[in-house]
Amino acid sequence: MRTSLTASLVAAAFAFAPLAVSAQGAPKGPPPLPEGAGKPLVEGMCAGCHALQLIQASSGYTRDQWRELTGYMVDMSKSPAQQNEVLDYLAKNFPPNNARPAKQVPGNFQITFKDWVMPQLGQRTRDPIQAADGSIWYAGQYGNLIGRLDPKTGQAREYPLPPDSMPHTVQLDPKGRPWFSGNKNGTIGWIDPASGKPTVYKMPDAEATDPHTVTFDKRGIVYFTFQNANRIGRLNPDTGEIKIVKAAEQRTQPYDIKFDRDGMLWVTCNARPCLLKVHPDTLQVTEIKLPTPGTTVRRLDIAPDGMVWYVNSGAGKLGRVNPKSGEIKEWDSPSGPKSHPYAIAVLDGAIWYNESGVRPDMLVRFDPKNETFQSWPIKSGNIYAGILRNARVTREGTLLIHQTATNRVMEVTPGPARGGEAISLTR
């Protein structure tokens, strides 16, 4: 399915609401786009899917680069005059800039990126995960779909979800079924890959409208977070029983959720300096306070030795909790306090994460043995655009990542340097 310029403008007509007004009558939100020919088209085309401040906060691009980037979002080929007007406006008002510079750390480790562009334009591909047969499932949040990629052929099949699901993630249960979180319509569900038929569970709590991240125990019981609803949930798919508890009385924004080796759940706090430890049977919550002021945590991963590694997104750090001793240690991320680390995965004794708050989005490798960093820019075609929001490890020891703005699923193969460039890109 391709999204045309006309369809984007029609969608924007319904989505483009007036700015909120404060008591003093001044509009809230980011400054308006610069005046000029093309502004109405850009507002109409872009605002139907994402906030206009994403354009203003971008690293800027040349005209050819804007052509490539917008080409992942909407098909303007049948409206060449309007396309030229849009590209001229974007290139003039948002040329390349260095407002959020990344700091690349050199080293002697080589990685190779391989990428695939998913079919539906503007879907914001995210959260790829490997299935038992080697295929890769992913969520297309803005496309209201989940998809299945055959990495051998590059072909993908995409499955439409019930209206307004807006899947925030896809996760596989012990039976290999792909589950999605209905982040906009308060549902959890799974798809039958053969028929495409969804099985959907509606949340019984009227305030639990945004299921977020999903995980499973060995029995297939589903556990999940609600970021804005400030809750944690559990679903028994066999009985349909759902239990939901508040994560805390304070605004916490539970985000990521994973099991440790002892069968306890760990949950990240995206609104304040904490992690949550949750008993899977009772859903009793124990809070672990983190030391750095301004800490917010997007994601975590559990190492084979039981250590809990997390990204301190709010303060630009990488952190580690020793569950046995309670010791907490943090390291400054290379690109600084505004680098906003996001996704994280433990792979082959190293910690891999990204710095989403800088441009380009940086993939970072941390060696805990000698406490050293190395980093690489994540490239999307001929541009640097998009954000990595989740990372998963494959059975072959590679890393599955993505870039939302360019609808890409990516595989990172790590290995020792053998000379040549620090990064090689293959397609």
Where are these regions (language model features)?
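Short loop/turn segments that connect beta-strands within beta-propeller blades
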Residues: 150-154, 192-196, 236-240, 279-283, ...
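Beta-rich, blade/repeat-based domains predominating
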Residues: 121-133, 163-175, 206-219, 250-262, ...
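The canonical Cys-X-X-Cys-His
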Residues: 42-53, 86, 90, 146
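C-terminal capping alpha-helices of c-type cytochrome domains
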Residues: 75-103, 399
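Electrostatic cytochrome c docking/interface patches
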Residues: 21-41, 117
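Blade-level signature of beta-propeller repeat domains, shared across WD40, Kelch, NHL, RCC1
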Residues: 385-427
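Conserved beta-strand positions in repeat-built beta-propeller and related beta-rich domains
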Residues: 136-142, 178-184, 222-228, 265-271, ...
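A short helix->beta-strand "capping" segment at the edge of beta-propeller domains
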Residues: 103-122
